From Swiss-Prot:
Name of the protein this chain belongs to: ATP synthase gamma chain
Naturally occurring in which organism (per UniProt): Campylobacter jejuni subsp. doylei (strain ATCC BAA-1458 / RM4099 / 269.97)
HAMAP family, A to Z: ATP_synth_gamma_bact
Topology in membrane: Peripheral membrane protein
One GO MF term: proton-transporting ATP synthase activity, rotational mechanism
Gene Ontology cellular-component annotations: plasma membrane; proton-transporting ATP synthase complex
Function according to Swiss-Prot or TrEMBL: Produces ATP from ADP in the presence of a proton gradient across the membrane. The gamma chain is believed to be important in regulating ATPase activity and the flow of protons through the CF(0) complex.
Amino acid sequence: MSNLKEIKRKIKSVHNTQKTTNAMKLVSTAKLKKTEEAAKRSKIYAQKIDEILSEISFQINKIVHNEDDMRLSLFHKKEQIKTVDLIFITADKGLCGGFNIKTLKTVSEMLKEYEAKNINIRLRAIGKTGIEYFNFQKIELLEKYFHLSSSPDYEKACEVIHAAVDDFLNGNTDEVILVHNGYKNMITQELKINHLIPVEPKSIEQTHNSLLELEPEGIELLEDLMKTYFEYNMYYALIDSLAAEHSARMQAMDNATNNAKARVKQLNLAYNKARQESITTELIEIISGVESMK
């Protein structure tokens, strides 16, 4: 009888877990739809800026080679790389399966790769998971940003990327790379590595025949464009990462719910079997008692 009570207690416990994971799945699904739309809008804007940079890349190259303006150093790839800043995004919350593993593994591999080349790599961590991971590994973090990956904010995104850009312009770093696990579709996430600085606009066929002209006096306009380019790439990465996180959590909770259902089914079978055995034992005892009284 005590065995039956124990199985019944387990069934109740697993069933409650199933309710919780299913509720979390529904919440993540709702959040994903909202974040997915925001990610699409941000991506379109960032792509348009990329297109503009591609369109004027020929003019940019002319200015870069003929001007010493410090702002144009954002387009200069240094011959010798001594320091690299790595901005990476992880989740602030858990229960999202292997969402953070790809990013943390990639960052760890990049650390080893650059150290092997005697290149100093500085980490700017966004998200509690990544911060705690590297703190545990006793690896120094240049910057730590909590609550930003779970609640992307444009002004905060600007703060993060402006600090990196300023360090590049001041000669404190030679390259800035942005790493995050991004959203691909409802069931898939993909790792994205963006070499943000120095900027290398992709040339397109129409460039040389373009009617656009960018004069050295228009560097201020270029500066505004670059500012927006960096800000939106940073903000888009945060939104994209959050959409991927919700997608991963939705999957993880769906798997957990299905596993809980399967476990409840197993426990119900075990309960019925134990109950049958208990009834059979009681019947045998009754029959044996009657026989002994004859």
